[in-house]
Amino acid sequence: TYDPTGSGSGIEAVKNGTADIGLASRSLKDEEKADGLTETVIALDGIAVIVHAQSKVTDLTVEQIAKIFTGEITDWSQVGGDPGAISCIGRESGSGTRDGFESITGTKDSCKLDQELTSTGGVIEAVAGNPNAIGYASLSAVEGKDTVKAVTVGGVACTEAAVLDGSYAIQRPFVLVTKDGTTLSPVAQAFFVFATSKDAASLIQNAGAVPTAK
């Protein structure tokens, strides 16, 4: 069975033997590896930073993005755009996309959002309708959209290739966590083999992530 309780709970369950496999949306910490846990990356999640389609801003650094979302940078003219008060659009508390974005940019619990929306589509729509807005969304949700544009981050575009080779900064891994020296049950072993194979790639892609098995 699958019990979606968050990365920490999944890791702890494998550690104490109550689960064969844990799913986490972050890499294992050194102390977790020291406890005999192993991670297997099955997918990567690229988080695009989006602005209005007509915005003059095309590139931002991770530091600039963090300063915008924490209210240190408040006007587009500070980062090469036309003058205008920046409107920050984000996801609601508890959103995996928000958690990933804030963890990577170092803005956890310090983002100052003008709007908190409950769907990726809502964020894209809000940014598309406001020339001064900035937001974030999974790469797969932004691809092919002409109502918003994804800025490059440190000169690197948010593409599958850049996520896979690690050059795009705002990304996180999805990992399967197992315990060293523990034999998986037949069902768990079958799932592990499938999840790490090319056969699972289309399912992972449809869920909005970039599969590592090609």
Model region roles, listed by residue range:
Residues T1-K214:
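Exported/periplasmic ABC-transporter solute-binding proteins
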